[in-house]
Amino acid sequence: MAEHPRQLQDPAHQPRSHQVVKAATAATAGGSLLVPSGLILAGTVIALTLATPLFVIFSPVLVPAVITVSLIIMGFLASGGFGVAAVTVLSWIYRYVTGRHPPGADQLDHARMKLASKAREMKDRAEQFGQQHVTGSQGS
C-alpha cells in the first residue's frame, strides 16, 4: 500500500463547507457541555444552601471530631514512617557490621579515620602543652 502524502492546508484555504462543519461541531460540543455544567452549578448551590445550616448547627461537634480524627491519622502515619526509618537504619547497620558494604560506608569510614587522626593530634598537643607547662614551672 502506497501512502499518499497529505497536503497540509492552511485554514484560510479550506473549503467553506469544511469550515461550516467544524464550526457546527464546535458549537454542538460546547452547547452539550454547557448544559451539564449549568446543572452541576445549580446542584452545588442548592446543596450548599441546604448543608450550610447543618454545618453551622453541628460545628461544635464536627470541628473537634475532625481535629481528633486528623491527629489520630497523622499519628498513625508518623509512627509508620518512624517504623520504616528504624527498619531501614537497622538493616543498614546490620549490612555494615557483617561487611556487606552498604551505601555510605566509605564516607563513614573516612569520617571515622579523620576524627581519630584529629583526636590523636589533640592528644599530642595536650601532651606537649603539659610538658611545656611542667618545664616552665620547674624553671621558675
Swiss-Prot record:
Location of the protein in the cell: Lipid droplet; Membrane
Domain of life: Eukaryota
Pfam families, sorted: Oleosin (PF01277)
GO cellular component: extracellular region; membrane; monolayer-surrounded lipid storage body
Chloroplast keyword on record: no
One GO BP annotation of this record: post-embryonic development
Location (main, coarse): other
Transmembrane segments: 31-51, 75-95
Keywords: Allergen, Lipid droplet, Membrane, Transmembrane, Transmembrane helix
Family, as annotated: Belongs to the oleosin family.
Protein name (Swiss-Prot/TrEMBL): Oleosin Cor a 13
Organism listed in the record: Corylus avellana
